[in-house]
């Protein structure tokens, strides 16, 4: 069965997209300062991309939301990630859905899909279908002993 873990800010864009998928999903809490939120089954992560870069005042910001960083800094949670899907805004040019690139590289998992803001009906259909294919593919690999667990390496900066 497909398991999704997602983060959505107060804008609720990612939340609305996940709801439209109609699949079992667990939301990473917005306020989980101690990083105690935990999952216990393999999952695909869906997250929005934040601005990233440096603010006018010189404050460093992250493409990956802080609650997601805390969630993935837990070795148990990190060991269960199987892939990532990212939301973003095309107004940010090359940074569009960049959080997905970061998670994919740092956790050594595939970046399955990117969509804008709340996604379109086509995005919802493609993600739903793609997730089914992805989980079936993983099951086949596991049955044939070809599956490998993602990296458990922990980063200090970003997930």
Curated annotation (Swiss-Prot):
Cysteines joined through disulfide linkages: none
Domain of life: Bacteria
A GO molecular function held by the record: FMN binding
Membrane-spanning residues: none
Biological process annotations from GO: protein modification process
HAMAP family: NrdI
Family to which the UniProt record says this protein belongs: Belongs to the NrdI family.
Function text: Probably involved in ribonucleotide reductase function.
UniProt-recorded name of the protein: Protein NrdI
């Amino acid at each position: 069965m497909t398991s999704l873990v997602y983060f959505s800010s107060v804008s609720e864009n990612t939340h609305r997209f996940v709801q439209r998928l109609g699949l079992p999903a667990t939301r990473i809490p917005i306020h989980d300062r101690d990083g105690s939120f935990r999952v216990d089954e393999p999952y695909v992560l869906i997250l929005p991309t934040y601005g990233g870069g440096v603010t006018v005042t010189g404050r460093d910001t992250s493409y990956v939301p802080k609650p997601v960083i805390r969630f993935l800094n837990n070795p148990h949670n990190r060991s269960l990630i199987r892939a990532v899907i990212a939301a973003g805004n095309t107004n940010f040019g090359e940074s569009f859905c960049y959080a997905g690139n970061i998670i994919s590289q740092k956790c050594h998992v595939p970046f399955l899909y990117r969509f804008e803001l709340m996604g379109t009906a086509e995005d919802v259909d493609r993600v739903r279908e793609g997730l089914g294919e992805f989980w079936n593919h993983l099951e086949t690999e596991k049955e044939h002993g070809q599956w490998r667990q993602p990296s458990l390496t922990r980063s200090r900066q970003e997930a």
